[in-house]
Design a protein with these regions (language model features):
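Charged, amphipathic alpha-helical coiled-coil/dimerization segments
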Residues: 63, 83-94
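Charged/polar positions within long, soluble alpha-helices
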Residues: 9, 86-90, 120, 124, ...
C-alpha cells in the first residue's frame, strides 16, 4: 500500500495501475494480485488505511487540544486533517475515499461521516454536549466542505495553500453557526 500511496502522491489516483504499484514496490504484478484482485481493491485499501490514520490523528488532537465547543472542535479537526494531508503520502489525492464513486456503495457511511462521528462522540463523552440531528448534519456538512477545500489547498503543494486552509476553517465554522447544542 505504501507503493500505491507514493504513486498516487505523484500522479493522482485516477492514473494508478496495479502495474505501477508493482513497479514502485519492486515486486512482480503477480505479487500485487495476490493481495489485491484489481486496482479498485488497491484504492479501497489505501482509502481505508487513510481513514484509520486520519481518525487516529483526529482522536489524539481532540484528546490533547480538544475544545468544549463545537466550533473549537471543528477547528482542531481541520488542523488534524491538515497534518494528515502534509504527512501521509497520497492522502491529497484519495483522502479518506469519499471521492471514489464505486457502485454499489459498500457502506452507507463515508469517511467524512466517520470523521464527523468522532467529533460528535468526543463532544458528547468529554463535554456532555449532545448534538441534535440538525447539529449532526451541520458537522457532517462542515467536514465535507473542509475536505473539499483542503483537497484544493493540497492539490499542487505538500504544504497546502494557506488561503484555502484558512477558507476551510472559515466555511466549516459557517456550516455550524447558529446550530443549537
Amino acid at each position: 500500500m505504501d507503493a500505491a500511496s507514493e504513486t498516487m502522491h505523484d500522479l493522482g489516483y485516477e492514473q494508478l495501475t496495479t502495474a505501477m504499484v508493482a513497479d514502485r514496490a519492486g515486486a512482480s504484478i503477480g505479487t500485487v494480485y495476490r493481495y489485491f484482485p484489481d486496482r479498485i481493491a488497491v484504492l479501497q485499501s489505501v482509502a481505508s488505511r487513510n481513514l484509520d490514520r486520519a481518525l487516529n490523528v483526529l482522536k489524539a488532537s481532540l484528546r490533547d487540544g480538544g475544545s468544549s465547543t463545537l466550533e473549537g472542535s471543528l477547528d482542531v479537526a481541520v488542523d488534524a486533517l491538515v497534518e494528515v494531508f502534509r504527512t501521509e503520502k497520497g492522502f491529497r489525492s484519495l483522502r479518506v475515499g469519499d471521492v471514489l464513486d464505486i457502485r454499489p456503495v459498500a457502506s452507507a457511511r463515508g469517511g467524512n461521516a466517520e470523521i464527523a462521528r468522532v467529533i460528535r462522540e468526543d463532544l458528547e463523552q468529554r463535554q456532555g454536549l449532545l448534538l441534535d440531528s440538525n447539529a449532526r448534519l451541520a458537522v457532517e456538512t462542515a467536514i465535507d466542505v473542509a475536505d473539499a477545500l483542503l483537497g484544493r489547498a493540497f492539490l499542487h503543494s505538500d504544504r497546502g495553500e494557506t488561503s484555502l486552509i484558512a477558507e476551510a476553517k472559515r466555511v466549516s465554522m459557517l456550516a455550524v453557526s447558529g446550530v443549537t447544542h
